[in-house]
């Protein structure tokens, strides 16, 4: 699939959206961002945690990424097991028996120049979208995400529902502060906290106005 799609792993990264095991990107010799290792540093852990990636002290992985982090970290290719439907603006450029392959045309190469105002950026905060907004302000002088509070409905003990309205072409994310939910279902697709950041959810983007049920 890599060869047939002409994947460039010299200038760009490739990530697996829904891995089955830790370090699966390494297993497939992908130049990804996920890692499970006792050599992980505190500085790296702080970075991926604040940016929204799924993480613990000795690991981090792609889950929790956004279009912004894909762009900034040069993630041009996404492999998604075809047991899951990916609602994305990225173009599907290949498929195999197990994976669909998507390409992100806005991914930046390994090195690029930014305003020196980024040196004043403080990597702090608990809301990944606000952290990314501040980082973008330091890089380009602009904020990207429009923030709003959404209400939830308690269905039964320990369970809440959200209904989030997205306009056509709008990419939605939902941040749930506090204790990470063990299981989340987004429009019928279930994800466990072991391999996903269930505090920070990618709601996808759609061709028509859509209500996403979480």
Task: For the regions a language model picked out, list residue spans one by one.
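Short beta-strand-plus-loop segments that form exposed binding edges in beta-rich domains
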Residues: 214
């Amino acid at each position: 699939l890599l060869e047939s799609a002409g994947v460039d792993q010299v200038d760009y990264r490739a990530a697996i959206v829904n891995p089955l095991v830790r370090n699966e990107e390494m297993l497939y010799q992908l130049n990804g961002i996920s890692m499970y290792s006792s050599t992980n540093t505190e500085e790296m852990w702080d970075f991926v945690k604040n940016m929204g990636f799924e993480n613990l002290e000795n690991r981090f992985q792609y889950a929790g990424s956004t279009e912004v982090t894909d762009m900034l970290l040069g993630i041009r290719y996404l492999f998604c097991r075809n047991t899951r439907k990916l609602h994305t603006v990225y173009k599907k450029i290949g498929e195999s028996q197990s994976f669909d392959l998507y390409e992100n045309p806005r991914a930046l190469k390994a090195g690029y120049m930014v305003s020196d105002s980024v040196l004043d950026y403080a990597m702090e905060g608990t809301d990944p979208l606000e952290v990314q907004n501040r980082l973008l302000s330091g890089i380009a002088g602009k904020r990207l995400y429009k923030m709003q509070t959404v209400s939830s409905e308690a269905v039964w003990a320990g369970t809440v529902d959200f209904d989030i309205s997205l306009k056509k072409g709008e990419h939605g994310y939902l941040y749930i502060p506090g204790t990470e939910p063990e299981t989340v279902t987004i429009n019928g697709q279930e994800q466990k906290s072991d391999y996903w950041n269930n505090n920070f959810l990618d709601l996808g983007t759609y061709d028509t106005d859509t209500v996403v049920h979480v």
